[in-house]
Each structure stands twice: as structure tokens, then as C-alpha cells.
């Protein structure tokens, strides 16, 4: 038999095998993470669709450090994209600063838990909450701060209240969101807008003056600053799928 037909059959077989392999390869490379969130394995600060950047990813805390220090305080850990602590420790702050931004994350606390996420924080004071505004994280049903709506879950801590009945019970995951565009800021919890305000306006100025924050002249004044995660309260805290994007 001539060698030419054999060569033609071999070439056809190789071509068919290559075409069959393409869908499988495409499926592996194009897999998307659920809910549009950045996959947990993505490196911190790697931009994803829509300009989102993951702040907690894989087993890395590369985007974070301790308040007024370059190292990560003991007591914080991140495993498979979940940041956690089980005891009181020093606060974390983001290495980057943000002015106008949108921040999303999921969180849960142990029974009686109390924590917070700060934004536009600076480091001239002993604590970040003396300069940065706080989105309160709380087990409303069991923590003392749950007795006041001004210090309940989702509140603009000490200034603007959050309604009752939105936060989930202890040890269940909540979804939170902050939108900050210039003076306008919104706090969201589990798909519901809980509070919004205009920073530096007359109402805001009056509320700050009537609060404990009046003792710190720089409180809430920065247009740009660090994000922070409160660690100084006892108890369990877990955060996952935390991501941020700049707004224009």
C-alpha cells in the first residue's frame, strides 16, 4: 500500500484530537467565580472585571498591616480567603488609601461579637477610630452596643442609626457594602440601605459636635485614607470576599 493514504489518515486523526481537546481547555481557563466576586485565589490588588480588587485572597495578608506599624499583628490569620481572629488584637489597616470607593465584604461574628470596618482613616492619633468613620459590625442580639441603634450593626457608629431586624444572628454570614463618593456616603447591609449622610455638611457637623468624636479635631475630615478592620474587641470575627473599587 502507498504511504500517502496512511499519512493523510494520521493527519486527520491528529486534527480531530486537537479539536476535541479545545472545549475542555476553554472550560478550565474561563471558569468564573460565583456571584461575580473575585476568586479567593486571586492575588491581593489584582484588578478583576469591573475594576474590583480583592483585599482578602488565598492565604495572603499582603494588602494589610497593623495600625501605625508595618507588620501584621498577632491574632489575625487568613486561610483559603477567610480572614479571622479569635481574640482581641490590634487593628488592621490597608496599605493603600482610598478616597471615592465602593467596598463589599461578607462577615460573621461569634455570640456577643463586636467589630467594625473603618474608612478614610489616618494615623496621627492613637487609634484609627479617632480619625476614620466606622461601619459597625455587631451581634445586635447579644452585644451591649445593640441596645442603641446608633451603635448597632450597619450604623455610622455614634452618628447615624441603623434599623433593627436586618443583621443576621451570630455565626451567620452577612453581606455589607459602603459607597463613598465625595461627601455622600451610604451603608448597606444584606441588600438594604441602612444609612446615608453628607459628610462635612451642617447635619454631620452637628452630630459630630454632639458625639464623643468632638474630642478629635481630625475625626472624619480626611477625603482620602486607609480602610481598617477593628481587632481590639474579644471574640470571633470572620471576613471573606472583601473587595474594593475606586469611583470617579
Spans of model-derived segments:
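N-terminal secretory signal peptides and thylakoid transit peptides that target proteins
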Residues: 3-14
Amino acid at each position: 500500500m502507498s504511504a500517502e493514504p496512511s499519512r493523510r489518515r494520521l493527519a486527520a486523526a491528529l486534527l480531530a484530537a486537537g479539536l476535541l481537546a479545545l472545549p475542555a481547555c476553554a472550560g478550565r481557563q474561563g471558569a468564573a467565580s460565583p456571584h461575580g466576586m473575585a476568586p479567593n485565589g486571586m492575588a491581593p490588588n489584582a484588578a478583576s472585571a469591573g475594576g474590583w480588587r480583592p483585599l482578602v485572597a488565598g492565604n495572603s495578608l499582603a494588602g494589610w498591616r497593623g495600625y501605625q506599624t508595618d507588620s501584621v499583628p498577632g491574632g489575625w490569620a487568613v486561610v483559603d480567603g477567610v480572614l479571622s481572629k479569635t481574640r482581641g488584637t490590634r487593628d488592621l489597616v490597608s496599605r493603600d488609601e482610598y478616597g471615592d470607593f465602593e467596598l463589599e465584604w461578607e462577615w460573621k461574628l461569634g455570640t456577643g461579637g463586636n467589630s467594625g470596618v473603618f474608612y478614610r482613616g489616618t494615623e496621627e492619633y492613637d487609634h484609627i477610630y479617632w480619625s476614620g468613620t466606622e461601619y459597625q459590625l455587631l451581634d445586635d442580639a447579644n452585644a451591649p452596643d445593640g441596645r442603641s441603634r446608633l451603635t448597632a450593626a450597619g450604623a455610622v457608629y455614634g452618628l447615624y442609626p441603623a434599623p433593627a431586624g436586618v443583621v443576621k444572628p451570630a455565626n451567620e454570614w452577612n453581606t455589607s457594602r459602603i459607597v463613598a463618593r465625595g461627601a455622600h456616603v451610604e451603608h448597606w447591609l444584606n441588600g438594604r440601605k441602612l444609612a446615608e449622610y453628607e459628610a462635612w455638611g451642617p447635619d454631620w457637623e452637628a452630630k459630630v459636635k454632639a458625639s464623643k468624636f468632638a474630642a478629635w479635631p481630625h475625626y472624619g475630615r480626611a477625603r482620602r485614607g486607609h480602610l481598617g478592620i477593628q481587632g481590639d474587641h474579644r471574640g470571633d470575627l470572620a471576613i471573606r470576599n472583601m473587595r474594593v473599587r475606586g469611583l470617579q
